[in-house]
Amino acid sequence: MIRQCRAGLRLCRALYQTSYRWHGKSACERALRYAPGESIHGFTVNEVTPVPELFLTAVKLSHDNTGAKYLHVAREDSNNLFSVQFRTTPLDSTGVPHILEHTVLCGSQKYPCRDPFFKMLNRSLSTFMNAFTASDYTMYPFSTQNAKDFQNLLSVYLDAVFFPCLRELDFWQEGWRLEHENPEDPNSPLIFKGIVFNEMKGAFTDNEKVFSQHLQNKLLPDHTYSVVSGGEPLNIPDLTWEQLKQFHATHYHPSNARFFTYGNLPLEIHLKQIHEDALSKFERIDPKTSVPPQERWQSPREYSISCGTDSFASDPEKQTTVSVNFLLSEITDTFEAFTLSLLSSLMVDGPNSPFYKALIEANLGTDFSPDTGFNNYTRETYFSIGLQGINKEDSEKVKAIINKTINEVAEHGIEAERIEALLHKLEIQMKHQSTSFGLTLASYVASCWNHEGDPVDLLKIGDKISRFRECLKENPKFLQDKVKQYFQVSQHRMTLSMSPDEQHYDKEAQLEAEKLTQKVKALSEEERKQIYEKGLELIRLQSKPQDASCLPALKVSDIEPKIPLTDLDITYAGDVPVQYCAQPTNGMVYFRAVSSLNTLPEELKPYVPLFCSVITKLGCGVYNYREQAQQMELTTGGMSVCPHIITDDSNLDTYEQGVVFSSLCLDRNLPDMMHLWSEIFNSPHFDDEERLRVLVRMSAQEMSNGIPDSGHVYASIRAGRTLTPAGELQELFSGMDQVKMIKRIAEMPEMGPILRKLSRIRKYVLLSDNMRCSVNATPQQMPVASKEIEHFLAGISRSKKERKSIRPHVVEKSSSPSSSGSEISRRATRKLVGDPTFKPCQMKTHFSLSFPVNYIGECVRTVPYTHPDYASLRILARIMTAKFLHGEIREKGGAYGGGAKLSFDGIFGFYSYRDPNSLSTLSTFQKAADWAKSGQFTQQDVDEAKLSVFSAVDSPIAPSDKGMNHFLHGISDEMKQKHREQLFAVTHSDLTNASNKYLTAGQCTRGTAILGPENRNIAKDPSWIIR
């Protein structure tokens, strides 16, 4: 990684000798040498501002000819990011900005090949590539650690957004079209097709999405926020190709653009390329895309909408959602918005907040309503508060509670200790280093900057915290005054309620059918003929091999041959192995521990995920659950627990099962954090039925709401269930089985039996037996951390008697980070369990859900991580996705997404997402295997697949996560280097051999699962299990 970056620096020096600021200086130092008024490649520097609390320097510029705005954030970070965003303000719900976002990425003047965006995924080492359509802007970001790659991607992105082809057939494919159900049969019925059309149909199966969309439309009804920028499925077929091209001409202009770059590459190089490749070809215009302020109401308003029923609701009679919404300040008033965001957090976050106490614990609903809290994605910010999972008759009660709570906060204010806890949380957020910090910043400033706000002022979080403290000091009722101003005096207040309608999806289907009939009836014979011919033309185009030679590409030789090594020190605290990893963590300490589940009785296993979810939220030691939450907020950045299932790296029938404990804190708070863990381990509370009931209902609601967004994940977990012993446990812990179990628990009248099961689990898990720990911190902090870990481990219990593993076949594997590790590190072992008698079997499951689209997973058992064929299968999955499945499933089939992947557990999986098809997609999966076996791909395709795989292998790792591959998965640097060498060595014949060996129908064991609407063909097939 370091060598790769240095190679990039040498390239930059060779190309741009004029970049004098680049030589021998840090990114921030170089940026500070710019002067306001200085001209650089057609741009003028407007402002240079150091922001020390975020270790960055911001340089604000504008383009002389076009007025394009530019923000460069210089930071010593090799994961460099580019983004360009346009203010896109549609006035109808045809989805024109969303369809345009898709279509500009389908080919451009310099790169006329079809789909350069997806092709660049395989010609680059990008760490991120995507595009987003928000309510009022469209953003195109990418990031990479390679300087040459940055220039390649920048060239493609600039040409895509400013000089796209916008071909009619691309509009048909990406947006919508009328096409015969079977495009080759003119007698088959005409239907609506299109990627965005199907994507939005899938999006609106999510009731939370439906609610959020209506909330914004109705609270801000005067301009662009009154429409669906992503597209309302019934309105999408009203968009014409001409309208799409016109929207591009008026909105995708440099005068309406905001450029953002981040990282340690020199600014001059970016400016030169952007000016020469794009901006020099334009003159300034007035884009007329500004959003006027919403006219404030004179009296509150109320609305009611309907949605689909939730088959996973814990109480079918309680499926109503109600919220009260308040329009707040302009987003460009950055301090006011900052203050209101803090006030919102204080009012709704955690069990000590007024609204949590008043609403969540009122036993009326399951969770807060969607969008609860502060929303700053529109020109004017807003606050939303409400409940979901309530009885419709309780709507008035909820509204009354909201009013009462607002009045109480206005009168009594917020406790000082809670304010300190929130400011502590902000301090941690500023110190914590993520690998995608550039993308985080680009997204953070996007909305405010979009409305002419100052993005640099937004970054000065330290200044805002100081000013906030000063305001509180000068006026102790500062926050109470804000509550009165925005929640009591203001009349711009909207109440929205949503209730299920059993006929909702039928009505949607009927309206779509009527729209279709209307469109078809209006067709002349000549137009019908053209539709048939265009359908055939689109298939020919989609099936035609693409020449992508016009696109820039890295070579496999650009990939660094060796991995950077991570120094790990493994010692013992008593008989517990502890991994120490010294890193520049910026004054933070990261603690993890793994506790084995090997001795846990089988009947308690299904309750492990619930145990993990609630163990840090029930109270412990001297703290009740409210006090515990307050202590966690005051002294930590969070404490979490989750199940841990890791398949062995050399045997698919062996796996580690456990629970992972994770937390982080500032250096100064390490003793307090470890004290909290001691209290949780030694004295957890399992005596509050009402508290558990609240947590279970929230968990059940969250799982149910997550299915429309993660349906393909649930399908894939289910499909892999019968292929390995770990797969069975994965389904139990994270699959549809867990969703249904939590739903059943939420329906139970008494929580006592569940509390007793959780208390029993504690006796097997919250012990130092079969535990290992890890710490990531600065070298200076390590001696203190070591003492605290030793003190913690010495103070927690051990089993009073030796417990045997429930599964008799136990495998001990060394935890040493290298074969030449110290004697102490070689003592450390991980205890895995195996089932030598396990026999994988085939199973096909269909979960019949009231969705208009399908989520599909098909899995094949292959080989473990260290097997020589694992590298071939990993590259095979990428080549099948890029060269076959993307075209068949997305372009031809109209699904939002689909592909193949190889997971660490040796499961080769096919999947599709928001897919209008079901059984035909399963046929496509088999065709993909046949295509791979036939070897219909080139050496160039193999090299591109390697680039794509290495972009994931070499993705940046934050200081907090260094060494985690070894600690959690048992993967050492030596093993990673060997795998790397195997990836480099994969040949064309290796891929065809792997396809024949592992993907041949009848020779491999497969699991299949579909989540989606009723299917008559599946219902008639006895080989399917229908749930």
UniProtKB/Swiss-Prot annotation:
The gene is pitrm1. It holds the Pfam family PreP_C. SUPFAM superfamilies: LuxS/MPP-like metallohydrolase. One of its GO terms (biological process) is proteolysis. Disulfide bonds join C113-C550. Metalloendopeptidase of the mitochondrial matrix that functions in peptide cleavage and degradation rather than in protein processing. Has an ATP-independent activity. Specifically cleaves peptides in the range of 5 to 65 residues. Shows a preference for cleavage after small polar residues and before basic residues, but without any positional preference. Degrades the transit peptides of mitochondrial proteins after their cleavage. Also degrades other unstructured peptides. A disulfide bond locks the enzyme in the closed conformation preventing substrate entry into the catalytic chamber. Residues 800-829 are annotated as: Disordered. Mainly exists in a closed and catalytically competent conformation but a closed-to-open switch allows substrate entry into the catalytic chamber. Substrate binding induces closure and dimerization. A disulfide bond may lock the enzyme in a closed conformation preventing substrate entry into the catalytic chamber, participating in redox regulation of the enzyme. Inhibited by metal-chelating agents. Inhibited by nickel and zinc excess, and slightly activated by manganese. Binds 1 zinc ion per subunit. It is found in: Mitochondrion matrix. It comes from Xenopus tropicalis. It is an enzyme of class 3 (hydrolase). This is Presequence protease, mitochondrial.
